[in-house]
Amino acid sequence: MYEYLKGLVTAVNPYYVVLEVQGIGYQLQVANPYRYTESMSEVVQIFVHQAVRDTDITLFGFYDLDEKQLFQKLISVSGIGPKSALAILANSDHSGLIQAIMNDDIGYLTKFPGVGKKTAQQIALDLKGKLGDLEQSATLVGQTAIDLGSQGDSPELSDALAALSALGYSAREVKAITPKLTDFAAQTTDQYLREGLRLLMKK
């Protein structure tokens, strides 16, 4: 069982990142792959959860230990698989997620892709009062907007839209926010993706 891997980020795409460790490239499925774009070819530490099935072994990567622990809590809930858990964690407002669980805010929880009312209620039921130190350590990650004007159909925007689809948002949902993202002042795919998630959570 792995706790974390430390190596070079050699590839980033909408579904995963590749981390090269001592000549071996590990494919890590992560909540927001483009978070690692600025770390390309740099040594980073990524926390890891290993899932073993009859047909494959999948590695899930996390920015820090809190994110990993929150993922493990989420997949313990009936109806929440690894893909759904990653889609939930893609929204960097983990403190908002934890507050929603503690306050039985079902409306907030159903905004995540693949989470209906029944599953949202199950999340609150199973995890309320069981998050321990996560409730104290969760932090709100702010977004930084760079004043560059409209970016049009930039490669960064296209990558962000693909990443939203990979997280499970429907084509209709992604299309609805595309005009706002086109006008959003951003420089990187990660910034577009964070803004897209913020807009989808407001629906």
From Swiss-Prot:
Pfam families: HHH_5 (PF14520), RuvA_C (PF07499), RuvA_N (PF01330). Homotetramer. Forms an RuvA(8)-RuvB(12)-Holliday junction (HJ) complex. HJ DNA is sandwiched between 2 RuvA tetramers; dsDNA enters through RuvA and exits via RuvB. An RuvB hexamer assembles on each DNA strand where it exits the tetramer. Each RuvB hexamer is contacted by two RuvA subunits (via domain III) on 2 adjacent RuvB subunits; this complex drives branch migration. In the full resolvosome a probable DNA-RuvA(4)-RuvB(12)-RuvC(2) complex forms which resolves the HJ. Keywords: Cytoplasm, DNA damage, DNA recombination, DNA repair, DNA-binding. The keyword Zinc does not apply. The gene is ruvA. It comes from Latilactobacillus sakei subsp. sakei (strain 23K) (Lactobacillus sakei subsp. sakei). InterPro entries: DNA_helicase_Holl-junc_RuvA_I, Hlx-hairpin-Hlx_DNA-bd_motif, NA-bd_OB-fold, RuvA, RuvA_2-like, RuvA_C, RuvA_C_sf. One of its GO terms (cellular component) is cytoplasm. The RuvA-RuvB-RuvC complex processes Holliday junction (HJ) DNA during genetic recombination and DNA repair, while the RuvA-RuvB complex plays an important role in the rescue of blocked DNA replication forks via replication fork reversal (RFR). RuvA specifically binds to HJ cruciform DNA, conferring on it an open structure. The RuvB hexamer acts as an ATP-dependent pump, pulling dsDNA into and through the RuvAB complex. HJ branch migration allows RuvC to scan DNA until it finds its consensus sequence, where it cleaves and resolves the cruciform DNA. Belongs to the RuvA family. This is Holliday junction branch migration complex subunit RuvA. Residues 153-203 are annotated as: Domain III. One of its GO terms (biological process) is DNA recombination.
